[in-house]
């Protein structure tokens, strides 16, 4: 990824960055429109997710997370920008004529070949079950449920590590630091997700944030008491409570919010590091 730094011609471009190499030219049969009605609101028009709204129109690129085209080699034709994610995507031309998008693995170049199957080479971009991978393999796009497609480790620069196998389960260390069990029959893609420098990208101005469909975040302490438990007071007042809370009165900043009766509770060997 080649990051271009804007010249400081105006305050809005100061320290702003943009990717100057990867462009977007999607195929018409692999894209479709999205209907965004009432950003962050439910069917009654009530805000259920704050700080969402506006944003540029997007076309959704249909990504092949399942990688279920077995033992048919494909060639990387393009590496493209996707407005729906931080990671890049690449267009694959398979030997039987079909074309699909996949997540771009780090280091993959135009002209490289990839394949998915049960016993394929341990090569960057290839997809295969965990049972056929050696220990220490760096992987991404990991399935949780067999045949459902990759759901874990799909963000830009993300990578997980296969650290153990025992019985029917494999032990993975995820980017968050969590160590959990996954069925060895589930598939994953070898390598790391591309666009590692996405976390170093600077938007430069508030308008760039609005283009992404994200609205401003306002602190509760500067609101009125009717709007937030931290609100009110004369001047710059403290929150007036023993512990900080959410806008709805629940404990915030450190309290665990994960449900205790989830089925995956027994599959997590070590919680994610904060």
UniProtKB/Swiss-Prot annotation:
Domain of life: Eukaryota
Coiled-coil residues: none
Gene3D superfamilies to which the protein is assigned, alphabetical: 2.30.30.30, Nucleic acid-binding proteins, Ribosomal protein L2, domain 3
Biased composition annotated in UniProt, kind: Polar residues: 7-24
Oxidoreductase among keywords: no
Pfam families (alphabetical): Ribosomal_L2, Ribosomal_L2_C
Residue ranges, annotated region (Disordered): 1-24, 222-274
GO biological process: mitochondrial translation
InterPro entries: NA-bd_OB-fold, Rib_uL2_dom2, Ribosomal_uL2, Ribosomal_uL2_bac/org-type, Ribosomal_uL2_C, Ribosomal_uL2_CS, Ribosomal_uL2_dom3, Ribosomal_uL2_RNA-bd_dom
PROSITE patterns noted in UniProt: RIBOSOMAL_L2
Major place of residence: plastid
Assembly information from the UniProt record: Part of the 50S ribosomal subunit.
HAMAP family per UniProt: Ribosomal_uL2_B
Protein name: Large ribosomal subunit protein uL2cz/uL2cy
């Amino acid at each position: 990824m080649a990051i271009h730094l804007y010249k400081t011609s105006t305050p809005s471009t100061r320290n702003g960055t943009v990717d100057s190499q990867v462009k977007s030219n999607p195929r018409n049969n692999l894209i479709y429109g999205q209907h965004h009605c009432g950003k962050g609101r439910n069917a009654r028009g009530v805000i259920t997710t704050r700080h969402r709204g506006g944003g540029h129109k997007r076309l959704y690129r249909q990504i092949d997370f399942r990688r279920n085209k077995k033992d048919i080699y494909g060639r990387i034709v393009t590496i493209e920008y996707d407005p729906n994610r931080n990671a890049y995507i690449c267009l694959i031309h398979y030997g039987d004529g079909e074309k699909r998008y996949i997540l771009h693995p780090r280091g993959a170049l135009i002209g490289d070949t990839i394949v998915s199957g049960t016993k394929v080479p341990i090569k960057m971009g290839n997809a295969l079950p965990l049972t056929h991978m050696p220990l220490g393999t760096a992987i991404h796009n990991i399935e949780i449920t067999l045949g459902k497609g990759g759901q874990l480790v799909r963000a830009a620069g993300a990578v997980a590590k296969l650290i153990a196998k025992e019985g029917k389960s494999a032990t993975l260390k995820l980017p968050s630091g969590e160590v959990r069990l996954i069925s060895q029959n589930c598939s994953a893609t070898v390598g790391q997700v591309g666009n590692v420098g996405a976390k170093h990208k600077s938007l430069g101005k508030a308008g760039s944030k609005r283009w992404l469909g994200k609205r401003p975040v306002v602190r509760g302490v500067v609101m009125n008491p009717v709007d937030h438990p931290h609100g009110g007071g004369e001047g710059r007042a403290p929150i007036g409570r023993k512990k900080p809370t959410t806008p709805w009165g629940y404990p915030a900043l450190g309290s665990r919010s994960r449900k205790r009766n989830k089925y995956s509770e027994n599959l997590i060997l070590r919680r994610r590091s904060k």
